[in-house]
Amino acid sequence: MATSLRLLDAGPGSLRRWIPTCFAALLLLPPRPNLGYNEDHAEPVCGAPWWSDSLEERHHWPWEVSLQIENEHVCGGALIDQSWVVSAAHCIQGNKEYLVMLGSSTLQPSGSPWALKIPVGDIIMHPKYWGQNFIRSDIALLCLETPVTFNKYIQPICLPEHNFNLKVGMKCWVTGWGQAKQHPSAKLTRSLELWEAEVSIVDNKNCDRVFHKKTFYPQVIPLIRKNMICTTNHRENPCYGDPGGPLACEVHGRWILAGIFSWEKACTKAPNLSVYTRIDKYTGWIKEQVSRGARSGRCRTSCLLFLPWLLQLPVSPGPPHPFLFLLCLC
């Protein structure tokens, strides 16, 4: 017991030299279900979707999820790990029982062998979430009751590093079962099939000026803050995104979760301005909550989520960092 206490009190130590020992120990453990990819032999990496050769499935978004109440779609979300989904905090409606549907691009996946519906076991709202008027810190983590097995149709998207270089004019993609108008006088209708739209990153200051014109807030009060992203598109029906749905940006062949759809100016005409929670401002909080969930036993997590962080720890003599033991058990 004394040894355990001493190790827990140790600071960042020689983690890198302990990693081979940890993985050697992992090889001696019996296999655990629902870990890694299945017989499709896809590599267990984030943000690397399988692209079909068929035109109909050219753009495939395997991290897209549907957050549902009583089997009715209410919001989108993004899978970041075998047990965790990121969505918008304003999607959470009190003590409801939520399901997450994965592995399907349609809201009616009858007969699909890949579609899964998994109950949400725990929900973590960001402590600074503000849902009045212009929403702030609009992010929530959903822990699945059962970890998923990754395959061609269910894969995680990568979390961005802190201060992710998101440039104005950069092209990204928003996906969801959003609403659209077939003509100006028509009612908004939800699509049963997953839609996608390419959007451009807009300068936050310019976006802020546009939103201020529609409100009585003085200019000195920023509506679009540093922890938000603003985008625009030029499609006829701009409302492709779902609240909580992902804004995905491709960087060097890897798809990054840049944002989570939060709110927009209007859903009537293009070009349309949409506002997202900027994920790189919350990456540290996400990893902290995932780590706590793993330690408490509520949610298992994948070691891959923490691997970039582990490799950045300094090398120094002494006992290993206690997080290494969490890595060995995850």
Swiss-Prot record:
Residues 45-291 form the Peptidase S1 domain. GO terms for cellular component: extracellular space. The keyword Secreted applies. GO terms for biological process: proteolysis. Its main location: secreted. InterPro entries: Peptidase_S1_PA (IPR009003), Peptidase_S1_PA_chymotrypsin (IPR043504), Peptidase_S1A (IPR001314), Ser/Thr_Proteases_Immune/Dev (IPR051487), Trypsin_dom (IPR001254), TRYPSIN_HIS (IPR018114). Pfam families: Trypsin (PF00089). It is found in: Secreted. Disulfide bonds join 75-91, 172-249, 207-230, 239-267. Residues 1-35 form the signal peptide. Gene3D superfamilies: Trypsin-like serine proteases. Belongs to the peptidase S1 family. This is Inactive serine protease 45.
